[in-house]
Amino acid sequence: MRVVVIDYNGGNLASAAQAARKAATRKGIEADVVISRDATDILNADRLILPGQGAFADCAQGLGPALRNMLETATANGTPFLGICVGMQLMCEYGLEHGRTEGLGWISGNIRRMDEAANASLRLPHMGWNTLDFTPGAHLLTDGLIPGNHGYFVHSYALHDGADSDLVATAQYGTQVPAIVARGNRCGTQFHVEKSQDVGLTILGNFLRWTS
């Protein structure tokens, strides 16, 4: 299996690649995990992973038209895709961090700052471990997990106005926070699977064996 971690000058590329290798080993999957922005690699990949940290606008600019087109072509042809943190956010219609920036438009909704005014105790960024709520068996990504397992979050912006049908798991932080989304062969996690220890490795392993 060829797994490509998209190189778009974003953060966490090496740690995401290493986590994917470890998850593959745990699942007994032979996986060649590479970090690349090369069209041949991306268009011939068996799995695509888009990590991300930083601002939505900066990450979107890092993709540029060429990588956007490659990702659109590959995923339209059925290649499973996993976005992590800002990589997940880029799947939506647009983001409002540092001005309005268009996303990939694969899922409904937009990325806005979480509302500190709604809860006096809310502090941003939302950083640290938080519990995941989901319906067991509803999606392969959560196989082997139980509601109440924890993911590691670091973000101040989150998905708003999304479609309930895209939601796989949520967390609570002053309000409901979309934690895992999926539509067809495209999925994403708001939390950092590469930092989420056994839970993250389980999700990555499920992604590697996932057929949408």
Curated annotation (Swiss-Prot):
Catalytic activity, EC: 4.3.2.10, 3.5.1.2
An example Gene Ontology biological process: L-histidine biosynthetic process
GO cellular component entries: cytoplasm
Chief site of localization: cytoplasm
Keywords: Amino-acid biosynthesis, Cytoplasm, Glutamine amidotransferase, Histidine biosynthesis, Hydrolase, Lyase
Subcellular location: Cytoplasm
InterPro entries: Class_I_gatase-like, GATASE, Imidazole-glycPsynth_HisH
Entry annotation: catalytic residues: 85 (nucleophile), 192, 194
GO function term, MF aspect, one: lyase activity
Annotated Glutamine amidotransferase type-1 domain residues: 2-212
A UniProt-annotated Pfam family: GATase
Known catalytic reactions: 5-[(5-phospho-1-deoxy-D-ribulos-1-ylimino)methylamino]-1-(5-phospho-beta-D-ribosyl)imidazole-4-carboxamide + L-glutamine = D-erythro-1-(imidazol-4-yl)glycerol 3-phosphate + 5-amino-1-(5-phospho-beta-D-ribosyl)imidazole-4-carboxamide + L-glutamate + H(+); L-glutamine + H2O = L-glutamate + NH4(+)
Pathway recorded for this protein: Amino-acid biosynthesis; L-histidine biosynthesis; L-histidine from 5-phospho-alpha-D-ribose 1-diphosphate: step 5/9
Its biological purpose: IGPS catalyzes the conversion of PRFAR and glutamine to IGP, AICAR and glutamate. The HisH subunit catalyzes the hydrolysis of glutamine to glutamate and ammonia as part of the synthesis of IGP and AICAR. The resulting ammonia molecule is channeled to the active site of HisF.
Assembly description: Heterodimer of HisH and HisF.
NCBIfam families given in the database record: IMP_synth_hisH
Name this polypeptide is given: Imidazole glycerol phosphate synthase subunit HisH
Source organism of the structure: Gluconobacter oxydans (strain 621H)
Gene (name only): hisH
